[in-house]
């Protein structure tokens, strides 16, 4: 897992919470082949970039009898294929007394399966010139592979092998408990601004335990995880009826459907426990907190506002307000805090620091953060934030400003969908399948934003960008500069 660096844009598909596979030093062992499809010979993956140009993306969506949601999106621009498996289990719905378990289990998924020994899944992709990774987010855990197109069947076989049965033993569990605890020490406990604000702010701003607990996990909880816990967690949450599979790239849909049926259809469904209640009460009073940081040399400040419910007109409006206020050097807050007043060198943030504005399911925060010199007062920073929001509220947002925000967002979104590895497309398709049962939303998103009116923008500012809906977290630096 890599430490999170807040991005300067809201829609990035960045490497948030990605498992660092390059440091795994895979063994040079052969791959077991008890499956009906033996792993093919190694070949280098071509690097031709994809050229997705619009939201008119091919989408074929269906559900297997065992409940697995499948999305196929052919793209013959480059001879590569991307496989993305998304499981509907993330930080928010991990067991109460097992904080950090969702992320711990992400690591266990690379420790071997029925037909692939420890590290052999990684070796299989790397030998075939591919790349792979996994991440743990608020509402899902995902795994993806990008390989030469003619290796697609092998990747589907391998991903199904993990879903069918994982090598969960005490040695693997103990080893990965140590790895995760070390990540906590390195990335949070022994790092200046460790966990700020992506890990800290949800704990201060939210009231519901599911949204507010330490996502990385308490070290005692990580130690307390038993082999039985891990086995039950896999059996429950890594079931086909709790997952979505997206396949994007250079393939023929009929052939890909046959492979998906061949390898995934026989995996049995498992009864799912009730989903936890993730709702947050309406915040009626501003909250301010201070966190001492013995390793930080400069003060830092983060602000957070509770988001509107996903897929509502106000939700789309706040995404556009984020473009106006916080995204890029032409944004209102950058201009006011950096260019005009010199309070900071940069201000960044967005919606969903562990992903983007679309790939989550529960409550979310719109956040921003910055560091500043000791001579700057935190009240001055908050005052400028209020001034810029009030300027929008008083002056209103005319149609031309709104149109510019849509164009800015559209450009950013298209950039992410045109990545050469097709992960941006796979991520959105799998997320929309998992949370909305409608991956074809990818082709109607721009239309949803164009429905937002200046009146809806004003309503959203008044309800969601009010000071009483805000949490402010200040880092008090204790280290000498």
What residues fall within each predicted segment?
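C-terminal motif of bacterial Sec signal peptides marking the signal peptidase cleavage site
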Residues: 21-23
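Bacterial signal peptide processing site
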Residues: 25-27
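An aromatic/glycine/proline-enriched structural segment found at the starts
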Residues: 45, 207, 240, 244-309, ...
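Histidine-acidic residue clusters that define the catalytic metal-binding segment
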Residues: 45-60, 202-243, 255, 275-280, ...
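M16 family metallopeptidases and their MPP-like homologs
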Residues: 78-94, 100-104, 118-163, 194-220, ...
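Bacterial N-terminal signal peptides that target proteins for export
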Residues: 2-13
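Hydrophobic helical h-region of N-terminal Sec-dependent signal peptides
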Residues: 14-19
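Mature N-terminal segment immediately following signal peptide/propeptide cleavage
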Residues: 48-87
